[in-house]
Amino acid sequence: MFLLFEEAGKFQAGRALSEAEASAQVELDSGKRVKVKAANILLRFEKPAPAELIRIAQEVAQTIELELAWEFAPEDEFGFADLARDYFSDKATLEQQAGALFRLFEAPHYFRRAGKGRFKKAPAEIVQQAL
C-alpha cells in the first residue's frame, strides 16, 4: 500500500512499510525512510506508483479553474476529496482527488487551510482584492 502525506508544507508519497495507530513508517522513492504522523496521511492507495500519482495529480491540478471551484465550494469547511467529487464527478479518481488537494493548497487567496486536507472558502471580498 502507498500513502500520500503532507510533511512541512510539501506533499510526498511512498510505500507504507508499517503502520501503527498514531504513525506510519514510509519508504520514499529515493529509498529514504520517514516516520509520518497518522494525522498527516491524506490518501491511501494501491495504484499507481507514488511518483506517477504525484505527476498526474500535478497535471490535473492545473486543469482546475479556481474561480469555478470557488463558486460551488461549500460555505462550511470541506475536504479536498469533497471538492474533487463536486468538481469532477461523484466517482472522482484518486488522481483527481490528489489534483484537487494540490490546487486548493496552492490557492490561499481562494481557499484557506483549515487543517490537514481541510479547507474553507475565502470570503468574496478577499477574492476580489486578490484579483
Where are these regions (language model features)?
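Charge-lined substrate channels and their catalytic hotspots, especially those that engage the 3′ end
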Residues: 1-131
